[in-house]
C-alpha cells in the first residue's frame, strides 16, 4: 500500500524527558510508523540549553535514520523571537544532528510560522534538511509565500481553503 502511518511524540507540550521520548519512538517504530513529528524540550529552548537540545535532536535523528523513519523536530521559533543568535544556533544544531525536517511550530503556541523564520532556516540549513512551516497559514497566498521562502512542507488546518484558493 502507498499509505504511510505518521504520528506525534510529546505534541504539543515538549515536556517529556529524552528517555520518555525514546520509549515512544521505539513503540511507534515497532508499529511501523513512517513519519513522526516531535516537539523539542521547551524548557531547554526557553533556557537556551543548546547542549540538551543537540543531544535530544541527534539521539532522535540517529534512531529515526536507523529505523527508516522521517523525523520532524519542532522548535517553536516564536519562543526565540528577538534572539536571532539562538535561532541560528538551532539551525546549526540541526545541521549537525540531521533531522529529516526542522519544523517552525506546533501551530498551538502563541505564534505560528513566520516568513522571516523560514527564510532564515532555508539560508542556514543544509539542503538535505527539509523545512515544515506550520501554524497560521490560512490561504493560498500565505501558503505560496511560505513555499517561495523555502518551506518544503506546510502544516495547516485550512488545507481545503488553501487548495480552493489557488488561482485557476
Each predicted region: which residue ranges?
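Short acidic/polar alpha-helix capping motifs at helix-coil junctions
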Residues: 23-24, 53-57, 83, 108-109
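Short histidine/acidic/glycine/proline-rich micro-motifs that form metal-
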Residues: 11-13, 42-44, 77-81, 108-109
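Alpha-helix-loop-beta-strand connector modules within alpha/beta enzyme cores
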Residues: 1-11, 50-74, 79, 88, ...
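Residue-level signature of catalytic and energy-coupling elements of molecular machines
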Residues: 28, 73, 102
Amino acid at each position: 500500500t502507498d499509505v504511510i502511518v505518521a504520528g506525534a511524540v510529546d505534541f504539543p507540550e515538549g515536556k517529556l524527558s529524552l528517555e520518555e521520548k525514546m520509549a515512544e519512538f521505539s513503540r511507534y517504530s515497532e508499529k511501523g510508523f513512517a513519519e513522526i513529528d516531535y516537539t523539542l524540550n521547551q524548557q531547554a529552548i526557553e533556557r537556551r540549553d543548546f547542549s540538551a537540545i543537540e543531544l535530544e535532536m541527534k539521539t532522535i535523528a540517529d534512531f529515526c535514520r536507523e529505523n527508516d523513519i522521517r523525523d520532524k523536530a519542532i522548535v517553536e521559533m516564536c519562543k526565540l523571537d528577538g534572539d536571532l543568535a539562538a535561532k541560528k544556533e538551532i539551525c546549526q544544531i540541526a545541521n549537525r544532528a540531521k533531522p529529516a525536517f526542522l519544523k517552525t511550530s506546533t501551530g498551538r503556541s502563541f505564534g505560528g510560522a513566520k516568513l522571516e523564520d523560514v527564510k532564515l532556516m532555508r539560508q542556514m540549513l543544509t539542503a538535505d534538511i527539509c523545512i515544515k512551516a506550520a501554524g497560521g497559514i490560512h490561504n493560498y497566498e500565505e501558503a505560496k509565500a511560505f513555499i517561495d521562502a523555502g518551506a518544503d512542507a506546510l502544516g495547516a488546518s485550512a488545507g481545503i481553503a488553501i487548495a480552493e484558493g489557488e488561482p485557476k
